């Protein structure tokens, strides 16, 4: 791991649940703007998606709700009051003074852990239109300069270097690096093409919207 400035989150790190929530909000803002901001139920489903998530989680509404309240207190999410349901949106750009490309990259790192430049280029196609890996490297180095991301040197058996976010606890970050080292190329998360993952994620989002609509209808019956 290269030497970088200390993370501003070192004394009050994000939990794994916090990171999953923020990453999910960043993703859905870009991929399903018609349903964003998200209701609590929609956010739980987004956090627990089987695609584009590493690791896959099984969070409860209670866990997500508690984390949202903590993130709101830190100025990283905002509650949007609605006539039918309250909704949540992230405020990473304002809260951390980030430009859109940096928000997109942090979102991906929150959702999938350490990743190569090529992985980030492929997986970011629905979040931000990056020209090439060098543009991604530029924004990652800007994040690293503020202690929000770090460059990981290539390890034995790996073909490419990786980057990871630095907003989590030391234990979580070490676990992510260890998991990366135990299976250098981590074939399973990359087994699906980016297009296939996008289609599956879109179907999961549509299903979540239908379930939410059904719940509202049943509640009004």
From Swiss-Prot:
Q: Which InterPro entries match?
A: DUF480, WH-like_DNA-bd_sf, WH_DNA-bd_sf
- Give the Pfam families listed for this entry: DUF480
Reading the lineage from the top rank, the first entry is: Bacteria
Q: Per the similarity annotation, which family is this?
A: Belongs to the UPF0502 family.
Which protein, by its recorded name, is this? UPF0502 protein PA3453
